[in-house]
Amino acid sequence: MAEQKSSYGYEELLACARGEMFGPGNAQLPLPPMLMVHRITDISETGGEFDKGYIRAEYDVRPDDWYFPCHFMGNPIMPGCLGLDGMWQLTGFFLGWLGEPGRGMALSTGEVKFKGMVRPHTKLLEYGIDFKRVMRGRLVLGTADGWLKADGETIYRASDLRVGLSKDSEGQ
């Protein structure tokens, strides 16, 4: 298991994506370009909105990011689903960070609201994930609420983000 730190840099997140942080068969982040986090600035097992733990992270937006030319030509916008996926990525990372075994999978979310867009001129995305509960059984299930800020303005909110870790999920 990884040393339980309160922040992680990009190279450490890449190590997690390669399966080197939490051990074989356990939680991993995706590799770029699907990795939607550049650094975890704070993570704790306590605190947050529900006092069940939280994670804060950042993503540096670049005008030449891969999604801008194709979504949409002449009207570049980061797909909202990528911000939502970043929230799921962080929820799964938290479960692995807690030392829970198994491979991660996004399961569902309650309500998602988009109130703004990420454009090429946007500089910084900030994520906040506040945990409501972690259930431990055959499947480890994390439930959290999340938000995404673009240059300091909250533009996405998601309730009841659910990510599971399963020991039965074999990598192919």
From Swiss-Prot:
Alphabetized UniProt keyword annotations: Cytoplasm, Fatty acid biosynthesis, Fatty acid metabolism, Isomerase, Lipid biosynthesis, Lipid metabolism, Lyase
Highest taxon listed in the record's lineage: Bacteria
Catalytic center residues: H71
Matching Pfam families: FabA
InterPro entries reported for this sequence: FabA, FabA_FabZ, HotDog_dom_sf
Record field: catalytic activity: a (3R)-hydroxyacyl-[ACP] = a (2E)-enoyl-[ACP] + H2O; (3R)-hydroxydecanoyl-[ACP] = (2E)-decenoyl-[ACP] + H2O; (2E)-decenoyl-[ACP] = (3Z)-decenoyl-[ACP]
One GO cellular component, as annotated: cytoplasm
Gene Ontology biological process terms from the UniProt entry: unsaturated fatty acid biosynthetic process
EC number assigned by the record: 4.2.1.59, 5.3.3.14
UniProt subunit comment: Homodimer.
Matching HAMAP family: FabA (MF_00405)
Biological role: Necessary for the introduction of cis unsaturation into fatty acids. Catalyzes the dehydration of (3R)-3-hydroxydecanoyl-ACP to E-(2)-decenoyl-ACP and then its isomerization to Z-(3)-decenoyl-ACP. Can catalyze the dehydratase reaction for beta-hydroxyacyl-ACPs with saturated chain lengths up to 16:0, being most active on intermediate chain length.
NCBIfam families on file: fabA, PRK05174.1
Record protein name field: 3-hydroxydecanoyl-[acyl-carrier-protein] dehydratase
The species this protein was found in: Brucella anthropi (strain ATCC 49188 / DSM 6882 / CCUG 24695 / JCM 21032 / LMG 3331 / NBRC 15819 / NCTC 12168 / Alc 37) (Ochrobactrum anthropi)
Upper classification of the organism: Bacteria, Pseudomonadati, Pseudomonadota, Alphaproteobacteria, Hyphomicrobiales
Gene: fabA
